[in-house]
């Protein structure tokens, strides 16, 4: 028994385009909402949670629908094609609405422009505002108008050009207040933006479960951790490509905080469509799924009657399996509570607290994950999925705990090291958690159980942007990493109670043992 890496890579192009989209979405939408619409962290968190609210019912629904779908292209492929096409078109349309809002801010949007700074000061001089750290201030009590209009986004320090803390602490919040005033005066643009955002999110939700369920459809159960490592490797490749693109477009630069995203989103859409074309030209879903079922019978992994019942539905779980599934899903909720809080807020945190390029830091995390995926899949096949996940949770908690003590003066290398550790940890968790869920079901229920997995993760992602945003508004942005560390610690505890879903020792399969001897 040996994993067909070529086929798995081709299947992974669906996840590649999904991760490309979400990397761009998570990094840019919070910046648009806060910088151009002037939303608080809490309200931007509400908007960022919309996709997760939709996912709570749409992912299980479309996972189950795809289980029952019988089409010429297979069960999953039609959903992937339709969802991707709509999402790519609507993403570009979203940038046009973003540009419309930018026009409402034309008198205050120019960076380092004295006239724009004068307008900001005149409008917000006597308002009580908040720094990114949560400290209240009144602009007129901190600066005269002449002092304020001399503030620049960057200053020279020790021979280096660095972000000016006065700019991020005082100019940015004041300009965001102006943006909120413009939004309140003309709310139609925000309404239209949210409507288009909903269309994009619905189209992505339509095919996420079918896309992820395709891997178990065409992969034997003992090989799914290795296959999921390849799938996640493809996803990370999509994410790191978008992060590199962000560096090219300088999306995290202070001078580009009010940039137009049309060109950037157009390239993202092109990447998604290119991946879809490769997927369509290479993946033979129905043929590969049938071959997998025949191999499962030949190797004794499933009885012939089980394989024949794949299309009809699944089996009922035992009481112990139900308990394990509940604790596993609870663990998924908890570690996503911690992890997604960081990913959804880090672009804002890095810009305002660390004064660092979030693209570079996240690229390091993705690169570390990419290097780890295949070794982690191999380790899990030997040590077991549960033990491997527990090790990953410990690493993730360590990374978040150390990161909580870092600030703008901390060595950049140290923050990069912590994000590298977090990338390795997340790879360790991600490679094994999804296979543990689908290990408990039959092939006829893979889409439904994929929906369970994503319902758990999305339930956390509904609440955590709002909760972390509220805490950041109340106590300052420094609360982000301690918040994340608490939830990953709780995930370690609940994971200890999971007793089912682990990979079975491969040595039990004679053909596989022979294959390993040949290797």
Regions found by a protein language model. Name each.
Residues 1-52, 130, 134-137, 148, ...:
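Helix-loop boundary and gating motifs at the non-cytosolic
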Residues 41-42, 221-231, 441-453:
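Loop-to-transmembrane helix entry/capping segments in MFS-fold secondary transporters
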Residues 68-84, 382-394:
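Cytoplasmic membrane-interface "Motif A"-like loop-to-helix N-cap segments
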Residues 387-430:
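C-terminal transmembrane helical hairpin of 12-TM major facilitator-type secondary transporters
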């Amino acid at each position: 028994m040996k994993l067909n890496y070529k086929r798995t890579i081709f299947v992974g192009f669906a996840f590649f385009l999904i991760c490309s989209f979400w990397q761009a979405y998570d990094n840019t939408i919070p910046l648009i909402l806060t910088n151009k619409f002037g939303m608080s962290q809490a309200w931007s968190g509400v908007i960022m949670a919309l996709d997760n609210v939709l996912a709570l019912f749409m992912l299980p629904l479309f996972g189950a629908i795809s289980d029952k779908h019988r089409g010429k292209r297979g069960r999953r492929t039609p959903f992937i094609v339709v969802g991707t096409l709509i999402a790519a078109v609507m993403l570009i349309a979203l940038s046009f609405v973003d540009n419309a809002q930018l026009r409402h801010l034309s008198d205050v949007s120019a960076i380092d422009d004295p006239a724009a700074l004068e307008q900001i000061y005149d409008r917000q001089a006597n308002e009580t505002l908040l720094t990114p750290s949560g400290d209240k201030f009144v602009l007129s009590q901190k600066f005269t108008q002449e002092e304020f209009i001399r503030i620049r986004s960057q200053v020279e320090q020790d021979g280096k050009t660095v972000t000016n803390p006065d700019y991020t602490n005082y100019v940015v919040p004041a300009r965001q207040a102006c943006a909120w005033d413009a939004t309140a005066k003309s709310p139609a643009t925000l309404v239209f933006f949210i409507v288009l955002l909903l269309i994009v999110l619905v189209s992505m939700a339509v095919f996420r479960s079918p896309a992820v369920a395709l891997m178990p459809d065409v992969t034997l159960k003992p090989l799914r951790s290795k296959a999921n490592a390849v799938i996640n490797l493809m996803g990370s490749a999509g994410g790191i490509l978008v992060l590199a693109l962000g560096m090219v477009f300088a999306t995290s630069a202070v001078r580009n905080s009010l940039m137009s995203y049309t060109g950037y989103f157009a390239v993202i859409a092109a990447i998604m469509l290119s991946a879809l074309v490769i997927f369509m030209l290479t993946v033979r879903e129905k043929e590969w799924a049938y071959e997998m079922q025949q191999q499962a019978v030949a190797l004794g992994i499933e009885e012939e009657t089980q394989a024949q019942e794949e299309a009809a539905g699944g089996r009922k779980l035992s009481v112990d399996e139900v308990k394990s599934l509940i604790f596993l899903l609870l663990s998924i909720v908890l570690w996503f509570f911690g992890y997604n809080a960081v990913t959804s807020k880090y672009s804002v945190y890095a810009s305002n607290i660390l004064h660092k390029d979030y693209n570079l830091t996240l690229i390091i995390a993705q690169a570390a994950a990419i290097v780890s995926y295949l070794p982690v899949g191999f380790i899990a096949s030997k040590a077991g999925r549960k033990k491997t996940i527990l090790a990953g949770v410990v690493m993730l908690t360590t990374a978040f705990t150390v990161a909580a003590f870092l600030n703008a003066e901390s060595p950049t290398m140290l923050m990069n090291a912590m994000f590298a550790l977090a990338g390795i940890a997340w790879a360790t968790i991600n490679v094994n958690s999804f296979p543990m869920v689908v290990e408990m079901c039959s092939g006829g229920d893979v889409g439904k159980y994929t929906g369970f997995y994503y319902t758990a993760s999305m339930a956390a992602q509904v609440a955590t942007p709002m909760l972390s945003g509220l805490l950041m508004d109340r106590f300052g942005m420094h609360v982000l990493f301690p918040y994340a560390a608490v939830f990953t610690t709780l995930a370690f505890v609940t994971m200890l109670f999971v007793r089912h879903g682990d990979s079975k020792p491969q040595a039990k399969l004679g053909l596989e043992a022979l294959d390993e001897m040949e290797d």
